[in-house]
Amino acid sequence: MAEDRFPGWHGTTILAVRRGGEVVVAGDGQVSLGQTVIKGTARKVRRLSPGGHEVVAGFAGSTADAFTLLERLEKKLEAAPGQLARACVELAKDWRMDKYLRNLEAMLIVTDGETLLVLTGAGDVLEPEHDVTAIGSGGNFALAAARGLMATDLPAEEIARKAMAIAADICVYTNGNLTVERISK
């Protein structure tokens, strides 16, 4: 019953595709509250440059929680410049141990153009097996489409755009207004 009185924020599909020496991270722009679209142009994919080392991050879940995690990730990257995996593991440790952070409801996809990682709400750090990963409400649709498109000769950005379009056609919490960031090592 409480869910009916306080509907949750829904939405977001974030997809990352690694191919040909680059990683493309794409995210849709829809933010929904219950059955209502609140915003269609949110930017859920960001470029970070802590210590001069470029990183692209996409987030799903609570926006405030995601920004908290992005800020902490930037601090971890400043402490370990150029060591994305180490910074993510340190963030995951904090996420699991800190009383406040444990309650954050967000997931991140992060990449430096070489390493591609997913940070889950449980404090896990996962490296995708097939050079493709996705999170959010339409994540499974985008992931399936992108994995199918990996069998083609399409470049990473085109795979990401086509897969996100498929996810937007299927998931009511995902739209076709994309933010796309490319990064290579």
From Swiss-Prot:
UniProt xrefs under InterPro entries: ATP-dep_Prtase_HsIV_su (IPR022281), Ntn_hydrolases_N (IPR029055), Proteasome_sua/b (IPR001353), Proteasome_suB-type (IPR023333)
Annotated binding of Na(+), by residue: 168, 171, 174
Catalytic activity: ATP-dependent cleavage of peptide bonds with broad specificity
GO cellular component, one term: proteasome core complex
Activity control summary: Allosterically activated by HslU binding.
UniProt keyword Secreted, yes or no: no
Annotated keywords: Allosteric enzyme, Cytoplasm, Hydrolase, Metal-binding, Protease, Sodium, Threonine protease
The enzyme's E.C. designation: 3.4.25.2
Catalytic residues (UniProt): 12
CDD domains noted in UniProt: protease_HslV
A single BP term in Gene Ontology: proteolysis involved in protein catabolic process
Superkingdom classification of source: Bacteria
GO MF, one annotated term: metal ion binding
Record localization: Cytoplasm
Coiled coil: none
Family affiliation: Belongs to the peptidase T1B family. HslV subfamily.
Subunit structure: A double ring-shaped homohexamer of HslV is capped on each side by a ring-shaped HslU homohexamer. The assembly of the HslU/HslV complex is dependent on binding of ATP.
Annotated function: Protease subunit of a proteasome-like degradation complex believed to be a general protein degrading machinery.
PANTHER family xref list: ATP-DEPENDENT PROTEASE SUBUNIT HSLV (PTHR32194:SF7), METALLOPROTEASE TLDD (PTHR32194)
The protein's name: ATP-dependent protease subunit HslV
Originating species: Cereibacter sphaeroides (strain ATCC 17023 / DSM 158 / JCM 6121 / CCUG 31486 / LMG 2827 / NBRC 12203 / NCIMB 8253 / ATH 2.4.1.) (Rhodobacter sphaeroides)
